[in-house]
Amino acid sequence: MKKHVLASALIAATSISGLAAVPSELESSRFSDSDLTPSPACLCAHPNGDVFVGVDMLGSLGKGAGKGKVVRLRDTDHDGKADEHTDFANLDNPRGLIAVDDKLYVLHTVIPASTGVMTGMHLSVLTDSDGDGKADGEPRRLIKNISCLKHNQSRGADHTTNGIRMGIDGWIYIAIGDFGFVDAEGTDGTKLSMLGGGVLRVRPDGTEMEVYTHGMRNIYDVAIDPFMNIFTRGNTNDGGGWNIRFTHQIQSGEYGYPILFKNFTDEIIPALIDLGGGSGTGVMFFQEPGWPEKYNNVPMMGDWGRSHLYIHRVTPDGPSFTQKEEKFIQCSQIADVDVDGSGRLYLAAWNGAGYKGNPKKGYVERVVPKGWTYKAFPDLSKLSGPNLVKGLKSESSTARLHVQQEILKRGDAGLAPAILGVINDKSCHKEGRVAAIFTYGQLLGGKGISALMASSKDAAIQEFCLRAAADRKPIARTLPTAPFVQALKSDDKRVQVAAAVALGRIGKGAAAEALLKASVPPAPGSHDKPNSGVVLPHVAVHSLVDLEAVDACLKALDSSSQDVALWALRKMHTAKVVDGLLAKLDSTTDEELQLKIMTALARLSTKEQPYDGSWWWSTKPDTRGPYYKPVAWEQSEKIEKAYRAAYENSSAEVKNRLADIATRHRMNLKGIGKVEVVDKAAAAKKGEVGRTSIEDVMLSFEKLKGNKKRGKKILSGMACVACHNLKKGDVIKGPDLLNIKLSKEQIAESILKPAATISDSWVTVTMNDGTAHLGTLVTKNDKEVIVHDIAGIPTKVKASDVKSVKTQTSTLMAPGLANDLSLQQFSDLIAYLSKKE
């Protein structure tokens, strides 16, 4: 066996530090401990200060019924610690929460006690009409089957649907993991299926469900700013080229995971940055008065893997942004974040609860500015209509949203003139005007369109008036295209994008020519760096596809809009498109256009197999593209015949280019480019650990029985003696392997992700003179401190000379040290380590 030298601490401590580290301007307090909120997977704050926590004792990989609930917490004396709690509802796998008025929207699974097997994941709403902290009855379904049941049953809820958040447009936005979903059904009968991850949205009553964006990996939540910019912080695919991504989610956008981001980058909206390894979790956009300016008006993004809440400083860049990340609050395996109407920030900490939950791990932290004093959020139900309208001008994004929801609940159209007054009040901050725009549009529906279009003449709010007007498809279908076509000529790129998206929703083919003329794709860029120039052509193409604008696109092949037209055509699998392209291929003498047409035909030669949920691409999927499971369709034979004919009649140089195109699009044409050969032989076992995600390694423990004797031999072959004491009498070097008190999953994680958890004994001793000693703490008393470095060499210092002794926040141990092992060998190793005495 190949020898491995373990460079530092192999085994993690039995617990992770539970103290949140906040900037000096802020202060934190423990709001609840694991006795009330163990394994908190999500939370939300009601504006009145009630905190709802989703307790998920199954974690990402656990199974079984009766291990989830939503707990309501209250801090009645506002001292930073919950002093009242009730079990609001028993629900399996609570993963997303929104509290509005007396309603709690919950994303959860159902696991009957009679079988212990999951039957589905749903978006539901619960009501507490008497305010006793307990749901009045059973959840009412808004969306049924919002994940892929087979994979939730076999794996657990790890790549499933997760966080939910409401925007100022009144939609509920849902973070879809890359399990995707099959036959998700809203209350109006709308059914959708989606292969892969993205963002879904639905009205609060469960109607009008639609895909908002697609092509993400395993996002956990969405952050929504007052202008309906949506941001996500994603999840790494464990070395496959898609790491943590901070992404601006633009309506109708395709982000490319896993089949487009590497080889078809020109067809995606790239991430704003790739941040390396980690696990993005709960996020929000924070805008609350009373907080220090530098921590306000920012996306706050949790990262479970890095145990930090981050801030991303976003700077406008045309229709999108650039960004700069900075650490904000350290929180042990942060799972979620939210704020109440009084400006109290709440963080859910998983805190080492593992992959299957732990009743003794997890907590909720409260963070406020130093000097913060409690100011009660008003009881909105008792406010007059005019005072509610004034609330739309609040400096608090929390207040504006909940004021809006109270107005909509009352449904008083008599408030519309006052709301319109806020829309047209140029002295009001833009956040207030935008809140008024979306409130007005929802309150009046189609009856408010004429006023919104009149207000759209104000350049400062044009983007939002256009968006609000076309936001609901039943209304959008009735709109004229002229104002939106005119908006495509705006000097403001954000207005152009809003208009392009709206024209696709309006659905009138007459707009196709304007969309084609407005869109010029930039040069292809990277999949993980900002490229704001691609946004307008990207959304225009998706609108052209929605419009089924075949004739307009074929006509544009002789114009400056040629590239956008071909981009749209290769996304439309119809006989009319194929025949039109073949006709143009025969009639043109432009060799470059011919090659572009051949590229489009290559793309159209197959299409994606409809997703039925019977399979999943795993945590490390094939990234070749352009389809994951390409299948032939009615026009495939015709395209192959034309492609072969063109190839035979081409020069050697053109043949080479056609062969490359065929290979790139995986046409599998014998004699033209590469033909894929499926290797049916069993995959080699060596190196399985390196090729397998950490979640799948954990799942393998359920199937593979570890052998302690074999594990001992494997450990000795890994030369751990270089850094650890393996038997009694060994010199203490790195953390002790003789007396490990961790679960199999915890030991495995500490090997596969050594930076995730650090042993409490792995410390830095800082002296009064500024010097420091790194190593394993052997002795600490009022007389002396002794540490052993990684070679086992002791350093003894006087306690009076020591300034501090702190647990290390990083490790010398590199990841990948067990990569060459098979899953069986790794299971044997863990069996030995977990049974050591």
PLM features: residue spans?
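Short inter-helical turns and helix N-cap capping residues of alpha-solenoid HEAT/ARM repeat scaffolds
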Residues: 395-396, 427-429, 457-461, 491-492, ...
